[in-house]
Curated annotation (Swiss-Prot):
Zinc finger annotations (CCHC-type) as residue ranges: 368-385, 386-403
Site (Cleavage): residue numbering on this chain: Y125, P126, S344, S345
Any Pfam family matching the protein: Gag_p24_C
PROSITE patterns recorded: ZF_CCHC
Region (Disordered): 400-436
Protein name per its UniProtKB record: Gag polyprotein
Cleavable signal peptide: none
Biased segments, Polar residues type: 408-428
Length: 436
């Protein structure tokens, strides 16, 4: 059913018999999105009633005790999915209660028909054994039904401290016994903090995939490579009994790749465990990285990716401050040249100059200028071009002058040394005053 028709049909279904509110396409999209968060694959585009029925059965089998989707949210998701199923199945419910009744009637009828089919098979093949963990769904097709929520939690706890180590590989071998190829990939992608480990595992899987494709050219009777890795197959096709050998092969590939990554991390110093010391020269650190990457079994693209990022992320604080503006994709020559002066006296003097330059900048960002020479970066009292009023030379003030030129003599104040004043007699213009 197309989205436009589905949206019109949803507007005719009320949420409850007592309310006039109707369902919208947003309610269905929300329910599908919540199912995807729980690891259940579903696509609303061109979905069929059988696919929605499988989704409802898988959602009901989940253990939501430790999940935030419980209570009202769980009930709302189930009710919305049942309304969607009833519309895709050709029913026209007026409200959600009628959709629940349609679903119950269909499940009872399917259960009875399934028992009849099982009875016929048992009568024909009385010694037939059921192949678990593949279980039979409501539409009769076998599929895997693992509790991926618990397995995601177990895997997160196993890789929380040390990433993919030997203990995590053992846990991975236990929890992937009942998983399909796509579910194993989802499990690996659930640890973003250990992205380097997962990328190494994926590179080793790609190498095995390439080797199998090469081998397949001379052995056409072997299983298809896409079937082994689960590529291009739906979840129901991956879970069929005919692909049991392919699931086991892919699981073995994943375990072998994870074990190689764990051995590379803990048996010898690998590139992920190499960090630059506080006083270690940057070229020596890069040399260690290159040596470790050369001994690693990975494609050249993966090695180059690790070298570009680890040379920046695992550098010490001083080198990282210089390398971050360049970025991981910068050429190695530029990185070596940028870190050449790190820790030297030239860099320290440069830091001091930048610190003093920041002091001479005003709060509003305007640079101070000297009123004597007009140059920025200092004020008049610190200017080196000011002249001494005593000797006339630049570079110091009169109070700091050490020149003997212009030194004051013992003459009375008001008379400078070097100046000679002649004493002249003054003739009075009037006779002296005589007092009787």
């Amino acid at each position: 059913m197309k989205l436009s028709k589905l949206e019109k049909a949803l507007k005719k279904v009320r949420v409850t018999p007592q309310r006039d509110d109707t369902y919208t396409i947003g309610n269905v999209l929300w329910a599908i999105r919540m199912c995807r968060l729980m690891g259940l694959d579903c696509c609303i585009d061109e979905a069929t009633a059988a696919e929605v029925a499988i989704l409802i059965g898988r959602f009901q089998s989940l253990d939501l005790q430790d999940s935030p989707l419980k209570g009202k949210d769980e009930k709302a998701i189930l009710t919305t999915l049942k309304v969607l199923w009833s519309l895709l199945a050709g029913h026209h419910p007026e409200n959600s209660d009628m959709a629940e009744k349609y679903w119950e009637a269909w499940t009872i009828r399917e259960r009875e028909s399934q028992k009849e089919e099982e009875g016929e098979i048992t009568s024909i093949y009385p010694q037939l054994r059921k192949n678990f963990p593949a279980v039979s769904t409501s539409d009769g097709s076998p599929r895997y039904d693992p509790d991926l929520t618990k397995q995601l939690k177990i895997w997160a706890d196993a890789t929380e401290k040390h990433g993919v180590d030997h203990h995590a590989v053992n846990i991975l071998g236990v929890i992937t016994a009942n998983l399909t190829q796509s579910e194993i990939r989802l499990l690996l992608q659930s640890t973003p903090q250990w992205r380097l480990d997962i990328q190494l595992i994926e590179s080793k899987l790609n190498a095995r995939e390439h080797a199998h494709r090469v081998w397949k050219e001379s052995h056409p009777e072997a299983p298809k490579t896409d079937e082994i890795i689960g590529k291009g197959l739906t979840a129901a096709e991956q879970a069929t009994l005919t692909t049991q050998e392919c699931r086991d092969t892919y699981r073995q590939w994943v375990l072998e790749a994870a074990l190689e990554v764990a051995q590379g991390k803990h048996d010898r110093p690998g590139p992920i465990n190499i960090h630059q010391g506080p006083k270690e020269p940057y070229p020596e650190f890069v040399n260690k990285l290159v040596t470790a990457l050369e001994g690693m079994a990975a494609p050249e693209t993966t090695k180059q990716y690790l070298l570009d990022h680890l040379s920046v992320d695992h550098a010490n604080e001083d080198c990282r401050a210089v390398l971050l503006p360049l970025g991981p994709s910068a050429p190695m020559e530029r990185k070596l040249e940028a870190c050449r002066a790190v820790g030297s006296s030239k860099q320290k003097m440069q830091f001091l100059a930048e610190a003093f330059a920041a002091i001479n900048v005003k709060g509003d960002g305007e640079v101070q200028r000297c009123y004597g020479c007009g140059k920025p970066g200092h004020i008049r009292r610190d200017c080196k071009n000011q002249k001494c009023f005593k000797c006339g030379k630049p570079g110091h003030l009169q109070r700091n002058c050490k020149s003997k030129n212009g030194r004051r003599s013992s003459a009375p104040s008001g008379q400078r040394s070097g100046y000679h004043q002649e004493k002249t007699s003054v003739t009075p213009s009037a006779p002296p005053l005589v007092l009787d």
